[in-house]
């Protein structure tokens, strides 16, 4: 796994995602045994597979190497013969994932997608309550042979002793309750052995209705719908579920009536029964845990919907499932009566409370001591900005919802693979996913120093100061396999004239005064009419391109471009075209042309031997081997 390049690992994830997609229908009946509705299972199964696809796509953000070359080199000497750079290599241990019961598939796939792309194998310990769902998929993953042998291992059951064997180079991540997570995090072995411990704990997440809303506004309806959805999807068993709903104090009664009214129409019970919108808790043990938390919450706030024991009228046979009907509390004094800020009932339970101002709302959110996510529902951009900047410090994510994005919004409770998932304080102070950010948790950053030739060889890309041997034949006559990093074409010179400037202005329509009006240059940096930067770049292409048909298929684009010095009529310019980096591309079909991307560093140099323009261009180049 470590020897594979990032693109190869990404293609491995893509193949795995496609394979699991072909089998996903077989996981739904298994998921239903956990009390999940079809929607709940879709979030878990399809959402989890979606994470694999997302991280497979990220392969394009990394170099075609088994390790990552980070950022830009640092010049450490006057003449440039000694430089520094950073490389990030896969850690030599394993990723140990201790997962929660609520999302037995998504919880596994959202983590292993990251460590597998990084080149680190995983040991997964699912919750014993729903491990049978995880096991069904892991069995298929192992049987597929898509992953290298041993890259994924499953440990079911209590998992006692699993942490006794972790060593330097391993990474441990935990998702679950605050109490269990804190107990694990405090074990001295993590400090003694230098093992990172990433904690993502359940938190008292909030949703805030903006002061611009009123009962007839679209945003009021969105708020009510979001609260009810977060209470009932997965029966409220989500680490991101809304536990505290905050509204302007003059809207408290209206919000209570609307939320309770919508909850009363929510059918709960056996997910196999047609029309059931909310399933059961994951186990009978969870009923007691939720009931205990509800009893504590009821000690200083008012029950306005449901029953304290979670009783209701579930569909199906009541004895067959861990059914718990939605419970809504109201707390009129959220500063004096604080149980809602301290106690989480991990089920379909939420507390409604008032606020007086936006800063007051942000303060109430922060009383949860750190949350994974808070939503603000508002149509006012100033409200959204003010609240976000005030509340962000106590949250891992701020979800802004209004009518303009509601149709496509992924919702309050859905962490996205390319965004960081985690939160401060009670939420664990950890971070998962986040696109490339997540991959970095499984890589060791190392600074390397030396001559640019040495570091260029390590980095797999040409670095400033490294040798640039003249290419023979011309680079455009070489196939992808033949092109060498650092090979350079030095062109003939071109004398820039006023005629060039006039003709380019006429052709392009760019008649900016600095190019055309020598009487308008007072107070500028220019001493005369200056050539267009894009003319210099275009003329550079005319100098370095070998126009005859050959291995180069097309110009793929420009990554960066800078015009570093004015070019005046009478200046001669030439180009150095240097191979900066090579990126292999996979064939999309049997008929596809085998090819790769070659990044060229283009340096335009004047007759004083100074750079006037630099750019990185990309070309698509045919391979010799078309198999």
Description of each model-found segment:
Residues 1-2, 76, 96-97, 207-211, ...:
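Short, well-ordered beta-strand elements within core beta-sheets of diverse protein domains
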Residues 63-222, 355, 408:
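Rossmann-like NAD(P) dinucleotide-binding subdomain of oxidoreductase/dehydrogenase enzymes
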Residues 5-11, 126, 146-149, 168-169, ...:
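Conserved C-terminal structural/oligomerization subdomain of aldehyde/semialdehyde dehydrogenase
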Residues 472-531, 623:
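Catalytic strand-loop segment that frames the active site of acyl-thioester-processing enzymes
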Residues 1-80, 265, 282:
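N-terminal Rossmann-like NAD(P)+-binding subdomain of aldehyde/semialdehyde dehydrogenases
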